[in-house]
């Protein structure tokens, strides 16, 4: 059975419950002088930029079923809207939940979360740091055999933390950050080789019993497994390209592939039948886990305003599945 662990990162942000979140971005210190090709990149570093945005961040996980499929668990978090500012590489966003567009929210149960992400966009290098705590998950309507409504469990918890370092080889002509921070513009199409290192820890747990309720068809194994721990570490390499057309419109994409060393453990829940203290249910296993980090950006920029869409997704493949996604639009 194959498990995926996916991680998605936005900018520096903290969110708590469904009241919204504050978001901060910091830029890596750049050695002076930093000389980039002004025929390819325009910088608005010393101008105050303001934006209005809509975004959604969520962490999901799936468990493999007895028939070889996967059962998807999602938190009940919301779309958010807010306003943000950037000046000299420092950004702050203030957001809150959007009323009226998160239908069936009460049927999906209650979720709480603390989602902190810090993204430091330097000219030559970037660093992404993650710290996420989610509690309360549901299975989609009609997805559970013999159950027509939403199945929710407010006791399931997910924890992730880690970081990604990326070096930008063609930093003089390729802007890695312009789609995310709005303080820079790619004037001509350009790309770059990207490479670096990934470290990620993830935990899925339920304190007093197995992660899956015994009544969930196809997940009998996980009615006893109360903790799933995973470490992933390894190098990544890829390519990013920004395509500029009609002078002001752009599409950007960056993909990094990796083969990480994956260490994972499964432990019985405290309330499972015949709990075994001490050793993990399956011991500690190690394998090589493929990984992918993808970023997409699209939009329009003028000298005074712009509209942008930005999406980031980070995926690891091993023996279970955890995933975080970030998507948003900026005006």
Where on the chain are the PLM-derived regions?
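Surface-exposed strand-loop-strand hairpins of Gram-negative outer-membrane beta-barrel proteins
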Residues: 57-80, 91-109
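Outer-envelope beta-barrel architecture signal
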Residues: 44-50, 79, 88-90, 123-127, ...
